[in-house]
Amino acid sequence: MGFPATPEQVLGSAAATAAWLRGHIPAGSPVLAVGEPGLIQELSQAGFHAMHVRDAPEDGVAAAIVVGLDRSLTYDTLAVAQHHILHGALFVATNTDATFPAEGRLLPGGGAVVAAVATAAGVEPVVIGKPEPGMAEA
């Protein structure tokens, strides 16, 4: 894009979400992600016990469910996320981008995945990514 920047100067929505969570739930808390490996890595590096919802243990409730783009979204993923949210997990979205451009066309974005989870759970998430204030607070 023509802007001079180092990697340390770039803050993506996954990193911003992990930073925001540090101020809202205790370190080491179980956090389940509906998202790609990069999201799980950011959550782990922030000090949480993070894993994809498909790897969630059968018992207990996560402290938070974090939802972003998940190109392997399944019905079971939605069902597990819904269960944890309905049983008290904090519901956080990395962003609500409905689409993103790729290979000359638009593809469903993280916001489409967030909308599916929100509809299933009947709960709206805390949104961290642009243009929400959580991005600046992170």
Predicted regions and their residues:
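HAD-like aspartate-dependent phosphatase fold
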Residues: M1-A138
